[in-house]
Amino acid sequence: MNEVNDFDAIRISLASPDQIRSWSYGEVTKPETINYRTLKPERDGLFCERIFGPIKDFECACGKYKRIRYKGIICDKCGVEIARAKVRRERMGHIELACPVGHIWFTRGIPSRVGLLLNLSTRSLERIIYYSHFIITGVNDEAREKAIKDLEVISSQRVADKGSEVDTRVAQMEAEDATVEAINQVRRDFSTEREQMEEDIQLLIDQLKDLQIGNLLTENQYYELKQRFSNVFEASMGAEALLKLLSYIDMDKERSKLIQETRSTSGQRRKKAGKQLQLVEAFRRSSNKPEWMIMTVLPVLPPDLRPMVQLDGGRFATSDLNDLYRRVINRNNRLQHLMEIGAPEIIIRNEKRMLQEAVDSLIDNGRRGKSVAVNGDHKAKSLSDLLRGKQGRFRQNLLGKRVDYSGRSVIVVGPSLKLSQCGLPRRMALELFKPFVMHRLVRDGLAPNIKSARRLVERARPEVYDILEEVVKERPVMLNRAPTLHRLSIQAFEPVLIDGSALRLHPLVCSAFNADFDGDQMAVHVPLSKAAVKEARETMLSIHNMMLPSSGEPVVSPSLDMVFGCYYLTTTRPGAKGEGKIFSDFEEAKHYYEMGIIDLRAIIKVRDGKGNMLETTTGRIIFNDVLPKEVEFQNMDIPKSAIKKIIGRCYKILSSQDMAVMLDKIKQLGFKYATSSGISIAMSDISVPREKAKLVAAADERTAISEGQFARGLITEDERYNSIIETWMETTDRITDAIQAGFDKQGSVYMMANSGAKGNISQIRQMAGLRGLMTNPSGRIIDFPIKSSLREGLTTLEYFISTHGARKGLADTALRTSGSGYLTRRLIDVTQDVIILQEDCGTSNGTWIVEPKEKGMLPPLVDRVLGRWAAHNVVHPQTGEIIVGNNEEIDEAKAKAIGEAGITEVFVRSPLTCEATHGMCRRCYGRDLGRVRLVDMNTAVGIIAAQSIGEPGTQLTLRTFHTGGVVGVDITTGLPRVEELFEARPPKVQSIISEIDGEAEVIENENGRHIRIFSDEVYQDEYELPSGWKTQVQSGQWVDSGMVLASPEMEGKSKAVVQSDQNVVARVAGEVSVDGSLITIKYSESEEREYAIPAAMQIKVKTGDSVRAGQQLTDGSINPQDILSILGRDAVQKYLVEEVQKVYYSQGVHINDKHIEVIARQMLIKVRIDSSGDTDLVPGELVDKFRYEDINAKVLAEGGEPATAHTVLMGITRASLSTESWLAAASFQETTRVLTDAAIYGKVDKLSGLKENVIIGKLIPAQCKSCKEATVERAERIAAAAAAPAVSTLPENCL
């Protein structure tokens, strides 16, 4: 049995008129849709049953044939074929156009493909298509030559005739004794007239010579020339003229001409010729013909894809396409009629233009001129509108589909659940698992057939719930919380049936879903096939997803009450009951606590299992009981950070199941002891420190001094502002110290903040001390502090100031969410085809990871190299011992050893330098951080990278910092900075960088500030003389280029010389030194660059400083394009990785470098061809780097000249649109432009990425091992079941 999806690639191309007719089941000739009385489709109309198929299954229009037994028969009465009604979704019709019509995608696109091919501007093309100008379509050279000769003959004849007439007149005047002056006047008049006649004739000859195919003529010019030279040229208007011209083009000749032009011209002309050459090559390589861009036949969409629905009250709702088709048919029919009756040319021309406009509106409404509206002011949705945008076919129906077997409900906490479980309401489960329950009822004999089983389920009999309990044990369910920002937003759980209507969620998975219980909703999905169930169990179960794929940190760490409970359990209370008692072992201590003899937090002495005496508490003993034996006794307070570390450690030594058990035990301990702690918070717990009044008064005094100095003009506005800010920041810190010093260490507020359960010292300072300095909406600190605390209450002005900045925070959050979502979408698109497809690409290249100079700006070296593969040996600097061998993984122990050895740079394999031609290899990627092992084959690492960068996007700030006081420079940070880098845009404040190595000189004068960089490098050029040669120069002598340095002493000596057959001549000018037979010329090459520095910029170098190429000369951010052009590919990749990392790390978000590297790789994967050599590549063409290298390797192997190219840095949007897959690009943005290009090039989508496979409904290529096995199983089962009849109504392959 062949599946519909059994193919490997999809090709898109232009459709020829014959192809359109072959798709069609008949011509639509009438604009009618359905008859409003009979409600049946009109014959030959837009819904005709004869063309598109019957409305009712196996029933013709007239009712003569009914039932399936007549399948395939065509009714002799009404002409309808007996078939299923669903053929009306597949069968197309066509309209034979009365005149050719331009396809708006090809005529109006940017650039216009038709215009580029015919060398016409968009404006000229529009004038032709819309019948305002004529274009010459043919010139008869013989007729032209004859016409020119005829004109010359006429000219000379006229001159001769006029001359003889003048001679006669002069003779007559002489006979009449006319004056000499009068006779001369007649001759002068003749001379002027002759010149005028020759000019007029020459003008006509020039006009004739200028007649070239493709020239435009206005209406007046056309009729004037046509009247005189009707046999010399042909010209016409509209799309038929373009059709004729396009059909004349000889692609091979055109190619040769354009290749010559690209080599012989430069600048704008060369660029245009390059574009034209690419287009010509596209037509040559594909089987498309350029005339197919002009339509003579219009396909009609199947009627069920543009339906008409009857509403209440007898009115009809119809798709806009029907109105647009109706306009086309009406105008086409009218044009045919006018042509048949021989209407005047002007009327026919007008009708042709209207037909062109109607077809334009049908294909892409609103692209040209005013858009066609239906029902008042509603813009009609054309065919293009159905494809593009969020509501278009690609994004709405192909990439995002509604899913069967799913439900949705509010979530509540399930503290008693295991980590792998979720609570599923019984009613919901019964609906979701209905087919399975019905199947089991029939199988167990509780119902005779499916129908009665359905009745039993609907009545919810007790035996139904018993079977439901069994059924839910067989398969997990998947829970999803929107927004689905990363893979942990969808996880699988074993369902536990519960009463009520809300889903119950395990408290430890909340952080993965970013869920809380304030009304959040979640969706439930049931995996149906065996493969889906297996994958859900083996990879999606929550116990297999405990680590963040972005950083490798634990994601199932306890929080809030659980953290507080564990902290409370492990803290000590001085003077507690039983303090100082000594016990023989842990069990005895616990026994005494249970009997109430000692307090939970009393400090006691106990012998551990090894016989050592420990000073600890019963609480710590209880906490350590839940930890594995491999973890040493944790004898300390356990705040949130400590719990995270313990979990991270345990993950490496325990299996997923054991880890889940341990986490559940920690959860239970936390909840139990948080409850027994009796934690509460009251106003009295927050006490204002005594020192506050004194500190605030001192700060007011200092502020008053600064204000006074400013008023007297002793300090500037900037200095005043900075002084006030500094004063209050210092005061705030002192008050914070006072609050901390006065804290009750056993108090609930301190314990909450210190444990990491909730709140921090900054919030306590605002409640007890003072709120301090606030920012205004632009992010600038307001130099008026809030001196009150929340405990004391704020004044009206203070309240206003605090809300002023806070409102910006709320607006930021709303904007951040959409901005971050769009960034994630672009990142996903650019990396969706990056999949692990190779074990090892075998490269020896890599990237240097260096210990950051500034701590806190970037992660430390040890964290960055963990999980990477070394690209060469990492050697201990002192002992010379190899810590990590070449091509070995750097695990925790080796990373620690690198840190201890004081190594500051390590050369590692990287996605940036991976040489896998498709996807990526396992060694270059390294460890899968979410699974803590080497990445598996077929893992979609591109998607993981995009999610890891996009998911924390909402946490980034959205502001532009305003540095300094009044006059400062805006520095872009946070999300806008990340976007700026990934889109490879010039930064908002662009730093000036040096293009050369050299010495700096800072110049300040009345013309402003400049930095001059000059380099004076000294080089040597050496000449080795053969024996018997004589030098012609002396040491210390200055020589010019081309001067003779040495010559043979006598004839017949060796002539193996450098540049001349006879003498050795200097290649460069410089100072000579002679040493025996070696002549050396010392010469220097000086280079200089000067940069103008804007007034607001701060200079980073001083006169005399040594400067490297690519070094920043001023503050601001560097343009990545400059780094690429000056320092090359590796430098720009490193810059992008470090700059993005700085933004995230400064906000406390940890992302592994490799995710950013995957994106950077995609941004630099294309090269632009400079010269084509002996390849088929076209100058200016963008080509994949690996394809370019392959083509060059083949050409070199055949002894040809390779192409040359330079690396291009593309922003993620451009990189997404220039992907090899046209399906992925079309579903991203600019759908019509992508499809236009893909059709012309006849592009083949090899379906290597994820998006294209989702679009066509195939399994994505990123399959886990279990899925692959299941795919094979499924194919075998389909083959076996092909002959067997269907048994029940169960979903496919779910048994």
From Swiss-Prot:
Coiled coil: none
Catalysed transformations (reactions): RNA(n) + a ribonucleoside 5'-triphosphate = RNA(n+1) + diphosphate
Swiss-Prot/TrEMBL cofactor(s): Mg(2+); Zn(2+)
Protein residues bound to Zn(2+) 1: C60, C62, C75, C78
GO biological process: DNA-templated transcription
InterPro entries in the cross-refs: DNA-dir_RpoC_beta_prime, DNA-dir_RpoC_beta_prime_bact, RNA_pol_asu, RNA_pol_N, RNA_pol_Rpb1_1, RNA_pol_Rpb1_3, RNA_pol_Rpb1_3_sf, RNA_pol_Rpb1_4
Binding note for cofactor: Binds 1 Mg(2+) ion per subunit. Binds 2 Zn(2+) ions per subunit.
Listed EC numbers: 2.7.7.6
SMART domains (alphabetical): RPOLA_N (SM00663)
Domain of life: Bacteria
Record's keyword annotation contains Disulfide bond: no
Annotated keywords: DNA-directed RNA polymerase, Magnesium, Metal-binding, Nucleotidyltransferase, Transcription, Transferase, Zinc
Enzyme class, spelled out: transferase
Alphabetized Pfam families for the sequence: RNA_pol_Rpb1_1 (PF04997), RNA_pol_Rpb1_2 (PF00623), RNA_pol_Rpb1_3 (PF04983), RNA_pol_Rpb1_4 (PF05000), RNA_pol_Rpb1_5 (PF04998)
GO CC annotations on file: DNA-directed RNA polymerase complex
Residues involved in Mg(2+) binding: D516, D518, D520
SUPFAM superfamilies hit by this protein: beta and beta-prime subunits of DNA dependent RNA-polymerase, Rudiment single hybrid motif
Binding-site residues, Zn(2+) 2: C841, C914, C921, C924
Molecular functions per Gene Ontology: DNA binding; DNA-directed RNA polymerase activity; magnesium ion binding; zinc ion binding
Similarity comment: family membership: Belongs to the RNA polymerase beta' chain family.
Assembly and interaction partners: The RNAP catalytic core consists of 2 alpha, 1 beta, 1 beta' and 1 omega subunit. When a sigma factor is associated with the core the holoenzyme is formed, which can initiate transcription.
Function of the molecule: DNA-dependent RNA polymerase catalyzes the transcription of DNA into RNA using the four ribonucleoside triphosphates as substrates.
Protein name per its UniProtKB record: DNA-directed RNA polymerase subunit beta'
Organism encoding this protein: Dehalococcoides mccartyi (strain ATCC BAA-2266 / KCTC 15142 / 195)
